[in-house]
Swiss-Prot record:
Pathway: Isoprenoid biosynthesis; dimethylallyl diphosphate biosynthesis; dimethylallyl diphosphate from (2E)-4-hydroxy-3-methylbutenyl diphosphate: step 1/1; Isoprenoid biosynthesis; isopentenyl diphosphate biosynthesis via DXP pathway; isopentenyl diphosphate from 1-deoxy-D-xylulose 5-phosphate: step 6/6. One of its GO terms (biological process) is isopentenyl diphosphate biosynthetic process, methylerythritol 4-phosphate pathway. Belongs to the IspH family. This is 4-hydroxy-3-methylbut-2-enyl diphosphate reductase. PANTHER family: 4-HYDROXY-3-METHYLBUT-2-ENYL DIPHOSPHATE REDUCTASE. Binds 1 [4Fe-4S] cluster per subunit. One of its GO terms (molecular function) is metal ion binding. It catalyses: isopentenyl diphosphate + 2 oxidized [2Fe-2S]-[ferredoxin] + H2O = (2E)-4-hydroxy-3-methylbut-2-enyl diphosphate + 2 reduced [2Fe-2S]-[ferredoxin] + 2 H(+); dimethylallyl diphosphate + 2 oxidized [2Fe-2S]-[ferredoxin] + H2O = (2E)-4-hydroxy-3-methylbut-2-enyl diphosphate + 2 reduced [2Fe-2S]-[ferredoxin] + 2 H(+). The active site is at E126 (proton donor).
Length: 316
């Protein structure tokens, strides 16, 4: 039994930046440091930050006055930003710059009183934050998830000639393309972003799974169940005909998965650390894997700076 390791996998630049922001804030300002929502969707990472003094909350009313709060990588609505400002909370923004790009697209469309369609999953914090960028009283913003959702928009959209679409950054590339095709069919004049909203890391990790799924008998995806991009990797493997399993830790592995397997694929979502991947590999070796081969893939060199305040403090 052999393991094929996907490349690229694991942390993306946005996740790396978000975690660094929490770590530096803890070092410089001392705990507790409050974080609105899980800074990234990974249980291993969140538990580690909790042990160091981070306190994760869902709403700003859980943050005491005169404290620091960090916004998660998924972004927040303008209403949340305004609330933090009114309470004079010290804010460090860990929103992924690629999510911020989508926020700016929505805000720009809102100022032009265009209607906006967001392709995304209801209830996901990134979707809530993106929807919360829209402020036009005369337009409207609508959420769709599947191509079948698009037809119902015909009764809602006021001006099909003044319509714009954006998407959640962590979706399935193929499924998003299907929704966009349907939007363009139903609304021929709809406008979209100059560059695809699906983030580079989401695209690259899905491409790596496509390569791996053709070769392996089983695909193991390291990531938490509330991680959108990790879930999409599992779903993609299954769509390509390979059994996929999404796991948070080595203890989640069922030896039965590998009974008839000769090649096991392993990848990790953008919020899963390499330390956790190594633990998973060790467990699969205990179950009989004799070697690990890393598959060649697209090289990533993206890097996002942390806020200047934390950079300056670190120098001092």
């Amino acid at each position: 039994m052999k393991i094929l390791l996907a490349n690229p996998r694991g942390f993306c630049a946005g996740v790396d930046r978000a975690i660094s922001i929490v770590e530096r804030a803890l070092e410089l300002y001392q705990p507790p440091i409050y974080v609105r929502h899980e800074v990234v969707h990974n249980r291993f990472v969140v538990e580690g930050l909790k042990q160091r003094g981070a306190r994760f909350v869902e709403e700003l009313n859980e943050v005491p006055d005169d404290n620091i709060v960090i916004f998660s990588a998924h972004g927040v609505s303008q209403a949340v930003r305004q609330e933090a400002k009114e309470r004079s909370l010290t804010v460090f923004d860990a929103t992924c710059p690629l999510v911020t790009k989508v926020h700016m697209e929505v805000a720009r469309a809102s100022r032009k009183h265009m209607e906006v369609v967001l392709i995304g999953h209801a209830g996901h914090p990134e979707v809530e934050g993106t929807m919360g960028q829209y402020a036009s009283d005369t337009g409207g913003m609508y959420l769709v998830e599947k191509p079948e959702d698009v037809v119902s928009l015909q009764a809602k959209v006021k001006d099909p000639s003044n319509l714009h679409y954006v998407s959640q950054t962590t979706l399935s590339v193929d499924e998003t393309a299907d929704v966009i095709d349907e939007l363009r069919r139903v609304f021929p004049k709809i406008q979209g972003p100059r560059k695809d909203d699906i983030c580079y890391a989401t695209q690259n990790r899905q491409d790596a799974v496509r390569i791996l799924a053709e070769q392996v008998d089983v695909m193991v995806v390291v990531g938490s169940k509330n991680s959108s991009n990790s879930t999409r990797l599992k779903e993609l493997a299954e769509k390509l005909g390979t059994p996929g399993y999404l796991i948070d830790c080595p203890q989640d592995i069922d030896p039965e998965w590998f009974v008839d397997a000769q090649l096991i694929g392993v990848t990790a979502g953008a919020s899963a650390p390499e330390e956790l991947v190594n633990q998973i590999l060790d467990r699969i070796k205990e179950l009989g894997a004799t070697s690990v081969e890393e598959v060649l893939g697209r090289e990533e060199n993206m890097f996002f700076e942390v806020p200047k305040e934390l950079q300056i403090k670190q120098v001092d």
